[in-house]
Amino acid sequence: FKSTPLLSEMPIGSYVDYTATGGSIGSKKVTCSSGNSSCTGIIANSSNDGTYGYCKDEKYKYTTKGYRIAYMKQNDSSEKQAFLVSASSLECINNIENADTKAIKYCNLNYVDGDCSCQDNDNNGVCDSASSDVWSINDNDFYAITKEISGVGRKLTNFSSKLDAVNCDNTFSSKECGYNNDILDNGGYYYFNAKSNNNSIYWDPAVRSINTKESGSLGLRPVIKMSSNVVVTGGDGTINSPYTISNNDIIINDD
């Protein structure tokens, strides 16, 4: 057995003790300060009453917190990598126009293969395209998460991407589309970084499915692509005892 198991060997949905530190937008450094609770996965609008915060409507509070393993993929070297997602929303945003830019600060150089950066060729403080290390949850992530749930990936809507998959538009109480799976169905409102006929796509906790046309202050959920070398050093993967992690270049196998 492995004395230090890989994070990519852990179950989907496991909680991970991850702290964001920041990255860079072009040459500009952005940080997730130690005093900002969102860096450790504490939800927007959290309070001291034991609830997990909300965006848009206090009636729909998130049911979970921290960071979780959302799905796995193989890299070009055929090594599995774990993709983390914030368990709920780390901040509330008014639109998705700069969602990938806002996600940059939730990176951590210790756990990714890249440099936690995005290009900003015109130096306007906005990512020209998403970083390869961290981004706002999008249609490709939805496909990967729903594939982990049912074995068959789904896309958000017919118009949100060119993915060859059944879409989840106007589909309710469908486990294949995330219903009752708290990686997606997490109690609160949040945006997907995708559009359908120029309409925003979001998770609607009132119907527990995706919806479109909403505007206003909904949640941002960063996705982080972890290095294949990240190992588990402790914890049991639950919300109260998340896996603690380290990035080791060499994994020692015990016979």
What is the meaning of each model-derived region?
Residues 1-255:
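Collagenous Gly-X-Y triple-helix signature in extracellular proteins
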